[in-house]
Amino acid sequence: MPTAYIITVGNELLIGRVVNTNAAWLASKLTYLGYSVRRIVVVPDVEEDIVEAFREAMAKADVVISTGGLGPTPDDITNLAFCKALGAEPVVNEEALKMVREKYASRGYPMTEERVKMAMMPPGAVPLPNPVGTAPGILYETGGKIVVLLPGVPREMEAIFEGYVEPLLKSRGPPAHFSERVVTVRGVPEADVAPIIREVMRQNPRVYVKSHPKGLEVDAPLLQIHIYASAPTPQEAEGAVDAALKKLVELIKSKFSNAAIY
């Protein structure tokens, strides 16, 4: 299964001012597309940290997606830091410049040095149109790897991903289908369910099972258990998940007669 890294850039994420919804949204999308998300990294608006994050991600993952830092303000430096990570001099991409110019002209704003910066990217990069904002995304391919830089504004990031990135990843990725089931278990502590989950995964190696406590471990145990799998066909993915779910319920009921499962 091809691997993916997600890099989210912004001081606001690290001080708790903004919740990192972009990472969760992208991780879900990538998982359903058949990519194994191996890291989600949050870095500040600091060049050396962004450079380091890109270099590590490109060394280890097949797909790297970043969000944030593509705008006109002084701390928007992700595109420039990415160039440095590649060892490339940033250039003004004429196609991207046209996109930015037209966006601002339609609102009656002139081009400025700060706005031109939004069109800067490494040579050979492809700008991705932003249908709801001003900063283009950036697509760069090297050595069989795909790197995508997206804006940090969620609706802009989502629009570019769904319009341009998702179709590309579908065409390049494996024929993968994702299936998931969620079951709730009341009355059994998570620690007691853990060996059952381990046994279910041993018997069903294509399936991942994860428990999420929603109540109090001792006084009022309540668990949500997620079961999911990826496979080349929907039938295989659903069959694997259904088999694991059946075994999970069977083992819990056989060991804990007081368990409520729904």
Curated annotation (Swiss-Prot):
Which family is this sequence assigned to? Belongs to the CinA family.
Q: Which HAMAP family match?
A: CinA_A (MF_00226_A)
Q: Which Pfam families match?
A: MoCF_biosynth
Name of the protein in its database record: Protein Pcal_0062
What does the organism's lineage look like at the top? Archaea, Thermoproteota, Thermoprotei, Thermoproteales, Thermoproteaceae
Q: What is the scientific name of the source organism?
A: Pyrobaculum calidifontis (strain DSM 21063 / JCM 11548 / VA1)
Write down the InterPro entries for this protein, in alphabetical order: CinA, CinA_Arc, MoaB/Mog-like_dom_sf, MoaB/Mog_dom
